[in-house]
A protein has these predicted regions:
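Transmembrane helix-bundle core of multi-pass membrane transporters
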Residues: 22, 26-110, 221, 248
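Membrane-helix interface residues
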Residues: 14-16, 134, 189, 217
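Alpha-helical transmembrane segments within multi-pass membrane transporters and channels
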Residues: 1-26, 105
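Helix-capping/transition residues at the boundaries of transmembrane alpha-helices
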Residues: 11-13, 110, 186-187
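Helix-loop-helix "hairpin" substructures at the membrane interface of multi-pass membrane proteins
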Residues: 69, 87-166, 191-192, 196
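Cytosolic-side transmembrane-helix boundaries in multi-pass membrane proteins
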Residues: 124, 131, 135-138, 208-249
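Hydrophobic core segments of alpha-helical transmembrane domains in multi-pass membrane transport
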Residues: 1, 26-34, 38, 94-108, ...
Length: 249
């Protein structure tokens, strides 16, 4: 939340675009992460990563049962192929329920609270919101702090919900943020629409890996499909303008 608030301060006080400052601050966070992992009390010997987080903090669904002999026998006996694929081949965890709850929380705040109304007003037009007496700078900082908190929650889910349950030294950014932008565009920035678009995005990405492994087809095909979907969604406004223009002729 504090990292997102810093982006908000840069936007509100100095007019620095949040995407630009966010990318730059992400690199600062990446190198700070690498610095911290290099500390002797945090770095696991003979590795470039931290120690694993405590197993009690893992949020993998049925983790102990599916790794037991009885669980593996039940999942791999061929009578439950879908459950076997999902539970054995993926790191399905309770983070999916947290994400859905977060989407509903964001929807409620934006559509059922005064603060949410002010945030939407500032996002739609900061000058009009300022003229209406809304504190634009405060709402910019609060909205980006809230976004940063959600990003922090996602990071915690990645560590506690997926192998290897530790923080590694990074040489580049994983790109989750840009995936998030793509998902938001596919949902037309609707908090509840994000649930469906995220599942579609994840399904396409997972399907791309399966296509590459099973058929030998290039996974770039899925990236082309995703890019095409996002392109036409982003162009929807232009299509409406074109339709209005042609309708007036």
């Amino acid at each position: 939340g504090l990292w997102g608030a810093l982006v908000g301060v840069l936007k509100a006080r100095f007019g620095i675009h949040e995407v630009i400052s966010g990318i730059m601050l992400n690199w600062i966070a990446l190198y700070f992460n690498n610095f911290m992992i290099g500390m002797s009390w945090l770095k696991k010997p003979q590795t470039e990563a931290s120690y694993e987080v405590l197993p009690s903090s893992w949020i993998v669904i049925l983790n102990e049962w599916k790794t037991s002999d009885a669980g593996r026998e039940w999942l791999l006996d061929g009578t439950h192929p879908i459950l076997g694929d999902v539970l054995i081949k993926t790191d399905l965890n309770y983070g999916i329920f947290l994400a859905i709850a977060a989407a509903f929380l964001v929807w409620f705040i934006l559509n059922r609270t005064t603060r949410g109304y002010e945030m939407r007003a500032v996002g739609s037009g900061s000058e009009a919101a300022r003229f209406a007496g809304i504190n634009v700078n405060k709402n910019i900082i609060l909205s980006l702090a809230f976004a940063g908190a959600l990003a922090g929650l996602a990071g915690a889910i990645v560590i506690t919900g997926a192998m290897p349950h530790r923080i590694t030294t990074l040489t580049s950014q994983p790109g989750y943020g840009f995936d998030g932008i793509s998902v938001a565009l596919m949902a037309n920035t609707s908090p509840l629409g994000v649930i469906a678009s995220a599942l579609l995005f994840a399904g396409l990405q997972y399907g791309g890996s399966s296509i590459q492994a099973d058929l030998g087809a290039p996974s770039e095909i899925i990236n082309i499909v995703i890019g095409t979907i996002i392109f036409f969604i982003a162009m929807s406004g232009a299509f409406r303008m074109l339709a209005d223009y042609l309708g007036k002729r």
